[in-house]
């Protein structure tokens, strides 16, 4: 009862929490496309609208390499990105997984309370993160800004996070396609990859004029340099920062990104086909596929939320208590973490750095793969993709496993699905690590999230167009 009372503590706030009503009937495909486009447009506009009242946003950014993963844009309404939503999801999953909160997903009331707790916690986290950003001087010294501007900045950030929460809920309720969180991440990262590959912006560095876009720069140097071998080497392996501290991408980064795209798409076809038959329609037989990437991009998204919050807290504490032993254990910071736990949990800056500090590399690889595997296992229990949930879905459609009695179907699914979840998380973590070490454009995690999301939308579009009446949620999207 105590666990249920904990959930019930949020009930009094339910009337005050904004909610998108579920559609009364199935939304036509064209309307889903329209709502998805409108949702994306609102997000992109918010990503370009600067915060009102900031003095400066030029201070060092401890979350720079995570911004693509969090769909965040510095100094705009999307400063926090999807961080409050994903952090809330992560915390509630950990509480449920550790049985500090007991939720029976078979009960509709418990499922509704679970969603309510996630939303309530996301709003609290948004206000907390916004307050921390403002009071730590991310936009100028609070003394210079004044109490009124500080409060206005906090309200802007929190309100923007609430809008993102509602946009995601709009799509999740069935008005649009897929998940708002995944859509926002994929869009931001596709934009970033395209820009780094084809940007026409020029920079003057030591060896002359360089284009920011790796492909554009390759064409330019091959036509303008007399030494073609040197031009080819420079196009593939150029490195270094511009005067404005921008890391120029090269063709190796571009092809590494394409390689990651190809590998992820290739792995999408790896699956275990479970034969099923209908009890209602005699002679109907089909298969229920359990994919290798069973939980899709969810594990790496939650792992990124965990590390981003750790890094932000570590940076915040280091700025105030830099001589404290425990604070230094969490992380010693300059522009990025240089030692401590935050350093070892962040990816190596390059493949060369990975070889120079193998302990850092091994800790990062182990943590990423283990955290992703753990989150993957926790996720299936709360997302409707556990063996018991799948067995109920099949039973509700009067489908049973061929060669098995109805009573033994759950046992067989329990043998397959948890293993698939663990393996899915570990593989996704390994892909993210490999992408980082290969030097994919942006970050390995961002490219992985982008690829899995695009493929997920491709599959969903196929189902919508074909009107598949037997489609089951094989790779659950982010709630």
From Swiss-Prot:
Residue intervals passing through the bilayer: 35-55, 77-97, 120-140, 147-167, 246-266, 355-375, 416-434, 441-458
SUPFAM superfamilies (UniProt xref): Preprotein translocase SecY subunit
Signal peptide start and end residues: none
Segments in the Cytoplasmic topological domain: 1-34, 98-119, 168-245, 376-415, 459-479
Gene3D superfamilies in UniProt: SecY subunit domain
Membrane topology value: Multi-pass membrane protein
Residue ranges, Lumenal side: 56-76, 141-146, 267-354, 435-440
UniProt GO molecular function: protein transmembrane transporter activity; ribosome binding; signal sequence binding
Pfam families attached to this UniProt entry: Plug_translocon (PF10559), SecY (PF00344)
Main location as per UniProt: endoplasmic reticulum
Keywords linked to the UniProt accession: Endoplasmic reticulum, Membrane, Protein transport, Translocation, Transmembrane, Transmembrane helix, Transport
Subcellular location as annotated: Endoplasmic reticulum membrane
Keyword NADP set for record: no
InterPro entries: SecY/SEC61-alpha, SecY_CS, SecY_dom_sf, Translocon_Sec61/SecY_plug_dom
Classification via PANTHER family: SECY/SEC61-ALPHA FAMILY MEMBER (PTHR10906)
Record's function text: Appears to play a crucial role in the insertion of secretory and membrane polypeptides into the ER. It is required for assembly of membrane and secretory proteins and is essential for cell growth. It interacts with other membrane proteins required for protein translocation. Upon binding to sec62/63 complex, secretory precursor polypeptides may engage sec61 to begin membrane penetration event. A cycle of assembly and disassembly of sec62/63 from sec61 may govern the activity of the translocase.
Family named by the database record: Belongs to the SecY/SEC61-alpha family.
The name this protein goes by in its record: Protein transport protein sec61 subunit alpha
Source organism of this protein record: Schizosaccharomyces pombe (strain 972 / ATCC 24843)
Gene: sec61
């Amino acid at each position: 009862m105590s666990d249920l009372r904990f959930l019930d503590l949020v009930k009094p706030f339910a009337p005050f929490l904004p909610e998108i009503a579920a559609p009364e009937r199935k939304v036509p495909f064209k309307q889903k496309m329209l709502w998805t486009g409108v949702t994306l447009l609102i997000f992109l506009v918010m990503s370009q609208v600067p915060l009102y009242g900031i003095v400066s946003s030029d201070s060092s950014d401890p979350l720079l390499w995570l911004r693509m993963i969090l769909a965040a844009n510095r100094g705009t309404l999307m400063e926090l990105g999807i961080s409050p939503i994903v952090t809330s999801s992560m915390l509630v999953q950990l509480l449920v997984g550790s049985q500090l909160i007991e939720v029976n997903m078979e009960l509709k009331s418990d499922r509704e309370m679970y969603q309510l707790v996630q939303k309530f916690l996301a709003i609290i986290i948004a206000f907390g993160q916004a307050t921390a950003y403002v009071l730590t001087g991310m936009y100028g010294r609070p003394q210079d800004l004044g109490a009124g501007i500080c409060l206005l900045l906090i309200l802007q950030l929190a309100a923007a996070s609430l809008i993102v929460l509602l946009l995601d809920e709009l799509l999740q309720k069935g008005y649009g396609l897929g998940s708002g969180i995944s859509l926002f991440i994929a869009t931001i990262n596709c934009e970033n990859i395209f820009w780094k590959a084809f940007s026409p912006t020029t920079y003057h560095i030591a060896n002359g004029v360089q284009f920011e876009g790796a492909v554009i720069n390759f064409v330019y140097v091959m036509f303008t340099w007399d030494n073609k071998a040197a031009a080819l080497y420079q196009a593939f392996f150029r490195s270094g920062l511009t005067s404005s501290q921008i890391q120029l991408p090269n063709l190796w980064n571009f092809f590494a990104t394409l390689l990651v795209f190809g590998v992820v798409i290739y792995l999408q076809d790896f699956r275990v086909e479970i034969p099923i038959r209908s009890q209602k329609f005699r002679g109907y037989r089909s298969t229920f596929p359990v994919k290798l990437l069973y939980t899709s991009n969810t594990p790496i998204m939650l792992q990124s939320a965990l590390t981003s919050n750790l890094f932000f807290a570590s940076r915040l504490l280091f700025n105030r208590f830099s001589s404290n032993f425990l604070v230094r254990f969490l992380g010693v910071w300059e522009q990025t973490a240089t030692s401590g736990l935050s350093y070892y949990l962040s990816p190596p800056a390059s493949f060369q750095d990975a070889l120079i500090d193998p302990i850092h590399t091994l800790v990062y690889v182990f943590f990423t793969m283990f955290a992703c595997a753990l989150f993957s296992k926790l996720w299936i229990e709360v997302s409707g993709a556990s063996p018991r949930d799948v067995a109920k879905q099949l039973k509700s459609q009067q489908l049973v496993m061929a060669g098995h009695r109805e009573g033994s179907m759950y046992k067989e699914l329990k043998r397959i699905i948890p293993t698939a979840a663990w393996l899915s998380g570990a593989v996704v973590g390994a892909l993210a690590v490999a992408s980082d070490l290969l030097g994919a454009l942006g970050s390995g995690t961002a490219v992985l999230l982008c690829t899995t999301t695009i493929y997920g939308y491709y599959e969903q579009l196929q189902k919508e167009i074909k009107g598949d009446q037997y489609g089951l949620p094989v790779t659950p999207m982010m709630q």
